[in-house]
Amino acid sequence: MLRRKQPNRFKTFYYAHPYFVIFNILIIYNIILIAVAALVMTYLMNGHTSGDVVMGLNIQSYLRNLEYCAVFTMNNGGIYNDAPLSVVIMKIILSILQMITFSGALIGLAASILQSMFNRRIHNVGKIKLKYHYVILEWSAVGPNLVRELSFMRGNKSIVILSDKDRDKIQEEIDNLFLETGTTKKHLKVFIKRGSPSSIRALREINIDKANAIAILGASSWLDSATQNDSASFKILMSVISITKKANIVIETDDQEVTRNIHNLMEASNDLKDAHISIFSRNTIVGHVLAKSAINANYPDLYYSLLSFRNGSFYSTDKDMSVEEALGKYSSCLPSFRYKCLNDKELLFFNAERERDIRKTLLKRKRATEAPFKKKISKSSFNLYVLGENDRSEAIAEAVRKHNELNEGKVNLKILPINNDIDDLLEDISKAKGRKKILILSDNNAKEENIDSNVFLSLIKIKANKELSQDIEVFAEIFEPSNRFSLETLNVSGVIIANQIVAVYMTQLLCHEESHKLYEDLLMPDNDSDIAFEIRQGKELLDCSNNLEFNSRGDFINALYISSKKEYLPIGFIGEQQKAKLTDVVTNVVSGAVSVTGKVISNIGNALTLSDSPEEVSIDFKDVLFLNKNLNKKDKIIIRPDTTMIVVHNKK
């Protein structure tokens, strides 16, 4: 039987404890140096006097020399006053060697240890001892948008990111988005730790059991296999659950079927039943937003404004109070609707800038109760052509089907995969009759440096096609936020930033775990939904041919709500487009004069500017005015036929 070789114990110990081993080697080296020097000193001092003692070649003389060689100073106590010059020189050499090899090495070792400590803190090596922080596990293109949306929350926020991606690249992506959008990191601290999000040890090092909420992102967002992404996310979820079930966990998946399967598993598993988990399919969410945006170009603005903390949010209370009663008592927030959440408990929801505003009540105040309510919902029918086919196509088709079932108009949907020359597809579209809209989908299989390039190529072809009517409404999906303004210079009716929609939706789920079903109904309403958020013009709900005037916001809200028999409650208006600070933007693209070479620019906005570095711009949407404060203030409200209102539609 062969004897198995064992690893070298010294080498193993050295690699496990390098500083300890080096320190001890320095001590041993210095002891040997002193011992050798004392031996040389004994030989040189033979026959000479040291104090009152005559030195010789004996053990007593050696020990006396050893004692004074060990003194790390040139002060020898006078023992070498009568010694020859060679002894003094020897002592000087010994002192210099000690200073260089021992003291110098110790200083260098201490500096190395301090540098290592600084590097560990800078790179977040070791345990991050935080509490009540937000955790992002794994990293994708949604990540920078999610960090930005969390920054809009009130108060101090700490975010810890755990991913095996390069931390410098993650930091650069976050900084670039904040710089491009002109957003400041106010009261926000971001810690990036490199490690496997499914590692129990790595999760414990970020104090995940003390976290407020946890977001599990898809591994590489839209660019990898859906099955691969979802299985990786589920593995991370299982690791998190093994440590904590207290935090609110939000997980995004690619496939709606996977979402349903995990929901079923949560109901059947005792380990998952008590956990606070919200799960959604990003393709389903974005697909429905794309479809609704093509139906009404204002919907992206509605969704972003309702979901982002920039304009406030919806906050709930369990007060046993009707919406009508609450409208007479609140002025700093807007009572909006009652809604039955996941636990079947009906709550009263307010739209407010801050959560504390819903605790400010007033004495009951009488408000206007009459308005010339005249329900005449506009119905529009058109042909919707979707150029391209990706993971959102199925959700788009489902959203169009629900829209047609709600009898709000007829949308004829045609999804056209771009397998052939796009000119042939555009020729078929130009020959079709009736009103037409085009939705361009971004290619989720494109390489990172070519993101959204197919959208620009398709748009240039559309603008250059002389057979197509120039009043055709064109909508586009993009992944890269900075490409939005470049598209708008090409007169695109609506731009939907897929990653941003996912980020704002995820932010609400992280902060309001009880409202998961509410926000799902907000983005994907159907016949079974109790409420819906709709965009209506003044003439669709009111007889306002001569314009209507109300003395305050509260009067207008209460009057429409009561006059519509509590069916419609206005919560805001959609105003003019925010003005982007773009310089030297080429606003007209001459047909046939634009060609895209093999080199595709990632931020295609640079290709449409005369400047190599465009100024900072905002990627946010149109101005949305929410009526969630100053309800009693004398503030004249004028409703015109074309006034665009955001209303809560109570269907029950």
List each model region and its residues:
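Cytosolic regulatory regions of ion transport systems
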Residues: 1-652
